[in-house]
Regions:
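A short, ordered amphipathic alpha-helix with a cationic face
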Residues: 17-19, 79-82
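Catalytic-site signature segments of enzymes, centered on catalytic residues
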Residues: 1-66, 90-106
């Protein structure tokens, strides 16, 4: 927060352009804490992870959280993969710091299709593109990239940090979701996910 408050300029006049930023999610986590009176990690655990039986998912808090069966990151160097793992404290909660599995991510995905956590009318707002003051759409909703692939609507997001690259794609009209989690810095999970979509769709 101190880093954000120290800024005295913006890249452009707000509303005139779109630029992805993790800072907004870090700020949102602070808003959740202020309104709920809980830590952000505690709020996620109580309101999302527990209700959905995401028992292997943790929003990491240094000195508090335990991460079982954790995968470690690697980078290809000098002809071999070598450990190159992020620090457990390198990700700020809100825009990162969550450890999960494909099984738990599937539970989260199912909850989105069934609107288990919030009503459909609230959930659907996340899948509406932002609009600039010019009237142009940004192609980004509330935490989702909105585009088309193979002539189908797609909502997705990528994520990466030292030693890890991941992608989560959803094709709501087809009821198809693809989650690719990797523990290496090289390669393209998005290409893998696109290939899976091509095979299925």
């Amino acid at each position: 927060m101190d880093l954000m408050m120290a800024q005295n300029s913006t890249y452009f006049t707000p509303g005139t352009e779109y630029r992805y930023s993790n800072s907004g999610y870090a700020l949102l986590a602070l808003v959740v804490e202020r309104i709920s009176g809980q830590s952000f990690a505690g709020f996620l655990h109580e309101n999302i992870f527990l209700p959905l039986d995401m028992n292997g998912t943790v929003a990491h808090e240094e000195g508090i959280s335990t991460i079982f069966n954790r995968a470690y990151g690697y980078t290809f160097s000098n002809g071999a993969y070598v450990p190159n793992d992020q620090s457990l404290t390198s990700a700020v909660l809100g825009d990162g710091g969550i450890y999960s599995s494909t099984t738990d991510m599937a539970a989260w995905d199912h909850a989105l299709y069934k609107a288990q956590l919030v009503p459909y009318y609230v959930l659907n707002e996340a899948f509406i593109s932002g609009t600039l003051t010019s009237g142009s759409e940004t192609g980004y909703g509330f935490g989702w990239v909105l585009d088309t692939y193979l002539y189908r609507n797609r909502v997705s997001h990528t994520g990466s940090t030292t030693g890890f690259k991941n992608v989560y794609q959803r094709y709501p009209d087809a009821g198809l979701s693809i989650i690719v989690l990797t523990n290496r810095s090289s390669g393209s999970p998005k290409d893998i996910a696109n290939g899976i979509a091509q095979t299925i769709l």
